[in-house]
Design a protein with these regions (language model features):
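Extended, highly charged
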Residues: 1-121
């Protein structure tokens, strides 16, 4: 199954049991990378409450790491087996797909819009 969005891919990882949630506060500066490194290649990790020096105290934006942490995950994201990966990359390079332009009204990136952003914490 080829996922068409990050949300879809996270759902697939959840269903496969390889997405772990960290619901406690984790500091971006050091803790998040340490946890991500420990899970590297085994699990994807979704941090629900990242905190940090440069983030607002009421930050609502989660952080995810390790979503293609090993060849098996990466192959599944591509919709092929591990053995088919190199062939799929070669095929994609030989036959590139043109980008699809979506109107700004229909773009999923506009689902969550914050009007007043404090860039200085």
């Amino acid at each position: 199954m080829v996922s068409r969005s990050l949300r879809e891919w996270l759902q697939v990882l959840e269903e496969d049991g390889v997405l772990k949630h960290v619901s406690k506060e984790v500091k971006l500066e050091h803790e998040l990378a340490a946890v991500g490194k420990k899970a590297c290649g085994t699990y994807a990790v979704l941090f629900d409450k990242p905190t940090g020096e440069h983030l607002p105290q009421d930050n609502q934006i989660p952080v995810v790491t390790g979503i293609c942490g090993n060849r098996s995950m990466f192959a599944k994201a591509m919709g092929v087996s591990v053995g088919e990966m190199s062939g799929r990359f070669s095929e994609a390079q030989a036959h590139p797909v043109a980008p699809v332009v979506i109107s700004s009204e229909a773009a999923p990136v506009k689902e969550v819009v914050t009007k007043q952003v404090n860039l200085y914490g």
